[in-house]
Amino acid sequence: RAPWILLACLAAIALCIVAAVTLLQPNTNPKNIEIPGTRGNIPATIQLPAKSARGEELPLVVLCHGFTGNRQGDGHFAPLAEDLAANGIATVRLDFAGCGDSTEPYANYTLANMAADVDSVIGYMQATYGTGKTALVGHSMGGRLASLYPQLGQYPVTALALWSPANGTGLQGLEFLSIDNFAAVE
């Protein structure tokens, strides 16, 4: 009878070890959501750290893609979001009007609308996940937006990272596209 008890104890210990290892592994899996915005829902991907200090606000980085891009950021945003989550920082990546999974017309891709979308995203993250200090990372046109967000947006940001930011609106020289309402796109 003693060998069975010993075997049962060893099995219980093994299960506890497996459970502990599983619980201690960071769970920073990205989650695709839609965030309510002023012009409709904003397709986004959030990535949260596995754990954060209790009672402390969670820092947030908003990743802003470039002209005709999407929230994947040419494949650079996902690894960046994973690294930030592993270091206790939440991220959200969004698709601006006419880009990625956005159902809005591309004519709505303006700096003012992009800033309004970032406002909606920051407000949502604060209300839903208790995020606090916020930084913006912007690539290309997203970098242009990030540089202007302190004047255009409603939320304070503590840091800006500009990744090859666009100069001007980024649309100069593209007149050959002959897009209807091209003048409406900033």
Describe each region flagged by the PLM.
Residues 73, 99-131:
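Catalytic nucleophile-loop/oxyanion-hole region of alpha/beta-hydrolase
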